[in-house]
């Protein structure tokens, strides 16, 4: 097992998580005793204990006082915070993970975009006004796109959407910089922003779902043209 890590704790965490992912520690199984596991990995028991607590908080493990540590089915117990880890564990499946991520974000964003234009159209107008000073670079578009989503999610009347977006942030930022490296993708997005601005100024929230659906289809087609050339390094949170 080849693991790149920045220190003992990082190595131990990646070792255990990869072992769970590769079914060496399958769901429902009991982890080796602390002393045995620390010797196996090559870290101190104190370091291992800290790592186990962190993995339990992320849903990988179940720790109960006086009982052995049990491996969870992370698909049932973890949250969006493990997206980065899954991308790192499964680079071959990363394009599919991104497809699923973008599909989920498109579906959810249609709800909070509509909510923002309904309940806080002035906020939507303010953030959309920034498109007129937007630099035509991948970095600027990726940053603005996240700002737009974050602002409208917070203004939608349900701030829980912001927490969902926060779970996507690191991964989406890297994918976004790659996606917006395409001039066609930037133009497509800019036209979408302009149409959304027109709706926001008119306080027309009823037409938002149709606009989002059209943009979702068109940006999805654009993504399919770009995904096969996506660098594998994007999966890594360096």
UniProtKB/Swiss-Prot annotation:
Principal subcellular localisation of the protein: cytoplasm
DNA-binding residues (ranges): 34-53
SUPFAM superfamilies the record matches: GntR ligand-binding domain-like (SSF48008), Winged helix' DNA-binding domain (SSF46785)
PROSITE patterns: HTH_GNTR
Positions of the HTH gntR-type domain: 6-74
Subcellular localization(s) per the UniProt record: Cytoplasm
InterPro entries listed in its UniProt record: FA-response_TF_FadR, FadR_C, TF_FadR/GntR_C, Tscrpt_reg_HTH_GntR, WH-like_DNA-bd_sf, WH_DNA-bd_sf
Keyword annotations of the record: Activator, Cytoplasm, DNA-binding, Fatty acid metabolism, Lipid metabolism, Repressor, Transcription, Transcription regulation
Taxonomic superkingdom: Bacteria
Gene Ontology MF terms: DNA binding; DNA-binding transcription factor activity; fatty-acyl-CoA binding
GO biological process, one term: fatty acid metabolic process
One GO term describing the cellular component: cytoplasm
Function recorded in the entry: Multifunctional regulator of fatty acid metabolism.
Oligomer status and interactors: Homodimer.
PANTHER family referenced in this protein's UniProt entry, alphabetically: FATTY ACID METABOLISM REGULATOR PROTEIN, TRANSCRIPTIONAL REGULATOR, GNTR FAMILY
Name used for this protein in its record: Fatty acid metabolism regulator protein
Organism: Shewanella putrefaciens (strain CN-32 / ATCC BAA-453)
Underlying gene: fadR
């Amino acid at each position: 097992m080849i693991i790149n890590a920045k220190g003992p704790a990082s190595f131990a965490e990646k070792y255990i998580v990869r072992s769970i992912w590769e079914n060496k520690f399958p769901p429902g199984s009991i982890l080796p005793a602390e002393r045995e596991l620390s010797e196996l990995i090559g870290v101190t028991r104190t370091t291992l204990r800290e790592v186990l607590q962190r993995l339990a908080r992320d849903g990988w493990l179940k720790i109960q006082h006086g009982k052995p540590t049990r491996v969870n089915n992370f698909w049932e117990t973890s949250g969006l915070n493990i997206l980065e880890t899954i991308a790192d564990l499964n680079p071959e499946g990363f394009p599919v993970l991104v497809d699923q991520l973008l599909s989920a974000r498109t579906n959810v964003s249609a709800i909070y975009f509509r909510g923002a234009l309904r309940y806080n159209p002035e906020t939507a107008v303010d953030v959309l006004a920034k498109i007129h000073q937007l630099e035509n670079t991948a970095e600027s578009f990726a940053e603005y796109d996240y700002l737009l989503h974050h602002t409208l999610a917070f203004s939608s009347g349900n701030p829980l959407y912001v927490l969902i977006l926060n779970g996507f942030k690191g991964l989406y930022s890297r994918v976004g910089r790659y996606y917006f490296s395409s001039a066609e993708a930037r133009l497509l997005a800019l036209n979408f922003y302009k149409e959304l601005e027109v709706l926001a100024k008119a306080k027309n929230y009823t037409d938002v779902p149709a606009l989002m659906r059209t943009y979702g289809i068109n940006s999805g087609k654009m993504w399919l043209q770009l995904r096969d050339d996506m660098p594998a390094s994007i999966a890594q949170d360096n």
